[in-house]
């Protein structure tokens, strides 16, 4: 990250530093909250528009699709044309799209506006962290990033609660409309208090081809998966869009290999440890994406919870993560990542099995809290070692690239899970309005997600090397392991990966965050890649 002159950089305790933090946290919080808040609103949206379950899926996947496909591009645009400029553009874009969501006259219009929201999120999310990295003096940078990650994680975590409250006291439309006044505050603060930075050495040749093929590939596959259950198996539209998706993804791989400045450099997958850790990420976040999408509906349609009660259901995960994630990082530092990465998914799987108790007349403290607490325990053990392994598996100068790729993998996993899982378990059409039908499908979905987590545990046990982590990998930096715990909380609660992607916070650090793209939470100190990784 290109830094302004030393005299222009700010300290953590300075007034301007706090304004920069406010703009960054509120901005990233907009995207984080909107990734989680909508799950709680799905039954209300379905009732108002009288649509089937596939339309509700698109309400989620349209946002994730554009966000996952374009977030690396958004970071590159900020590097080249100014991080504050692209951040502010993203916030304005996001606010306008939010107004379109809140005023949408139909489900189709809402889905289109959600896709536009994802584009705004892809523009603002990378810049929120990059502005902090470039603006603060090196000795305060880790502390500032810790505040950003912790408060941003909390913002993401309260999304379902906020959504439930707004739905109960107003309307689901306010889930989106509330973004507009917040965006005005962010823009005013950013324009007045955040310095402009860019990378003068960065290339202005943006990988538009890669971004386009990524959107087309993920979009084609997502449409085919969601549309297949409601169309004949011989439907040309389904087969054609699926084929376009596959061909586009193949083309994406070819294009990224040939590009001089690729959006996703494929060479980093030459590390076996990096590839294995991302495979574990895909399985784990696929399971979480599917569960959290369906659980919010299950609690309302089957268990009879209000939107507010359903929104509070996952808050215990946040508490557990805040309290215990640092311990998971410390354990991985002492004994290596293999055991935490193997045991964590198994504990999460046990939590999901306990969710099978959530049915008709389920009670919050006896049927919902126990599985959620067990799930939080597994996540606290898993996430910090997983992300540290991703970063340690490649050379330290590519830490930002690795974080961005891991972020994209996690988002893509959730996207595919939300698209595919309901179809596999028979949740289509009006099934979300029939408690018995939805309960049956939910339980089958839980078992599938348990299988994914068991596969992730087996993959970690058989492929992850304990030697991949150096002594300074997890929790040894100025930010400390608490940074890992704070950021992880919000990320996992919603399936949104809110996190820290930071270079060393020590004096004289000049490490660069590639595109400043945030991924799942990572340690501030990243060791060089180990031989044989």
Regions found by a protein language model. Name each.
Residues 1-16, 200, 463-533:
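Intrinsic disorder in cytosolic terminal tails and internal cytosolic loops
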Residues 2-192, 328, 335, 341, ...:
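Transmembrane-helix bundle of Major Facilitator Superfamily
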Residues 18-33, 38-40, 53, 128, ...:
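12-transmembrane solute porter fold
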Residues 78-85, 141-144, 200-206, 262-265, ...:
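Interfacial helix-loop-helix linkers and transmembrane-helix boundary segments
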Residues 107-108, 171, 198-203, 228-234, ...:
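Membrane-interface helix caps and helix-loop-helix hairpins in membrane proteins
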Residues 187-210, 254-263, 461-471:
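Helix-loop junctions on the cytosolic side of multi-pass membrane transporters
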């Amino acid at each position: 990250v290109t830094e302004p002159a030393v005299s222009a950089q700010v300290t953590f305790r300075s007034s301007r530093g706090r304004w920069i933090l406010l703009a960054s946290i509120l901005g990233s919080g907009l995207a984080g909250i909107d990734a989680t808040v909508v799950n709680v609103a799905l039954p209300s949206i379905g009732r108002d528009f009288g649509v089937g379950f596939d339309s509700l899926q698109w309400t989620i996947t349209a946002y994730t699709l554009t966000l996952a496909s374009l977030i690396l591009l958004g970071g590159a645009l900020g590097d080249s044309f100014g991080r504050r400029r692209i951040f502010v553009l993203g916030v304005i874009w996001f606010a306008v799209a939010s107004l379109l969501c809140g005023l949408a006259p139909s489900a189709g219009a809402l889905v289109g506006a959600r896709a536009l929201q994802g584009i705004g999120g892809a523009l603002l999310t990378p810049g929120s962290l990059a502005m902090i990295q470039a603006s603060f003096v090196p000795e305060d940078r880790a502390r500032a990033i810790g505040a950003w990650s912790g408060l941003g994680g909390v913002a993401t975590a309260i999304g379902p609660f906020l959504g439930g409250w707004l739905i109960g006291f107003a309307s689901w439309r306010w889930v989106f409309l509330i973004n507009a006044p917040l965006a005005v505050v962010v823009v005013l603060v950013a324009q007045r208090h955040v310095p402009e930075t860019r990378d003068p050495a960065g290339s202005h040749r943006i990988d538009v081809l890669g971004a386009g093929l990524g959107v087309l590939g993920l979009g084609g596959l997502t449409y085919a998966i969601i549309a297949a259950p409601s169309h004949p198996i011989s439907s040309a539209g389904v087969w054609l869009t699926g084929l376009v998706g596959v061909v586009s993804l193949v083309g994406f791989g070819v294009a990224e290999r040939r590009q001089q400045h690729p959006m996703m450099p494929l060479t980093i997958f030459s590390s076996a440890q990096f590839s294995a850790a991302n495979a574990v990420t895909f399985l784990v976040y696929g399971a979480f994406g599917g569960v959290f999408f369906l659980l919010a509906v299950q609690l309302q349609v089957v268990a009879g919870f209000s939107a507010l009660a359903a929104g509070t259901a996952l808050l215990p995960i946040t508490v557990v993560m805040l309290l215990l994630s640092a311990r998971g990082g410390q354990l991985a530092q002492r004994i290596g990542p293999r055991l935490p990465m193997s045991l964590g998914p198994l504990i999460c799987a046990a939590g999901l099995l306990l969710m099978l108790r959530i049915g008709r007349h389920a009670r919050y403290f006896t049927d919902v809290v126990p599985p959620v607490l067990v799930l939080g325990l597994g996540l606290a053990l898993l996430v910090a070692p997983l992300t540290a392994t991703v970063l340690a598996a490649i050379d330290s100068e590519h830490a930002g690239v690795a974080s961005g790729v891991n972020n994209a993998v996690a988002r893509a996993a959730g996207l595919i899970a939300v698209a595919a899982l309901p179809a596999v378990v028979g949740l289509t059409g009006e099934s979300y309005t029939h408690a018995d039908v939805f309960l049956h499908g939910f339980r089958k979905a839980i078992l599938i997600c348990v299988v994914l987590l068991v596969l992730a545990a087996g993959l970690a046990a058989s492929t992850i090397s304990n030697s991949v982590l150096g002594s300074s990998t997890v929790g040894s930096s100025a930010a400390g392991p608490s940074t890992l715990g704070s950021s992880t909380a919000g990320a996992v609660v919603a399936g949104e990966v809110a996190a820290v992607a930071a270079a060393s916070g020590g004096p004289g650090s000049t490490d660069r965050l590639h595109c400043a793209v945030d991924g799942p939470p990572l340690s501030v100190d990243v060791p060089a890649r180990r031989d044989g990784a």
